[in-house]
Amino acid sequence: MVVRIDGKIAAISTDYAALAAISARLAQQKSPAYRKVTAETVGFDDVWDIRNKAGWNDMILFGTEFQKKVWRRLFDLTHEEDGSPKAPRLISYSDFADLCQNKAGVRAVAHAIGLNPAAVVIPCHLVIPKESIDYIKGVQEKAQSTIFKGDDISMEKLLQEKGIDFGEYALGRRLKRALIQKELSQ
C-alpha cells in the first residue's frame, strides 16, 4: 500500500497501519496543512517502479530530524544527488552509522532504520549485520584465490545461501532477502 499526501509518498506498507498512523498525526495538527491523503493498494512491481522513479523531494516523511537524516542517507545508497538510480550496495549497521556521522550511535541509527516509513523506496533492506558482510567478503576473496578460480560463486548464488543472516525487517525476513536479491541482481 502506498500512502500519499498531496501526491507525495508518505509511507509504503503491507497494511493500513501506516495510513492510520499518518491520519492520527495529521488529526493532531491545529490547522490542516495538507489537502489530500490517499492510500492505494499496489503490487510489488508497482512499488519497485516507484522506487526507481522517486526522488527525495517526491516524499513527505514524518519523523525527527535525526530519523530524516538517517532515511536520507539510506535513500542515497541507491540514488545519486540528482535522484537518478545508482548501483546499490550492502552495508553493515556499524558502517552505516559511521556514514551517518554517528559511529557511537549504532543502536540509534538502527532504530531509525527500523522506523523507515517508505520501505523499498528508502532501501533499509540493504543494511545488514556486520557478520554477514564479513562472510560475503570472505567468500568473494576465496573465489579470487587460485584454489577456487573458475568456481561459480556469483553474488546471486551467494545471496541465496540460507546460512546468511540479513537481519530483521519490518516487512519480514523473507521479503528482505528477496529485496536484496532483486536489488543486487540488477
Predicted segment positions?
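Short glycine/serine-rich loop segments
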Residues: K103-R177
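Basic nucleic-acid-binding alpha-helical/helix-turn surface characteristic of O6-alkylguanine DNA
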Residues: M1-K103, S145, K149-G163, R174-Q186
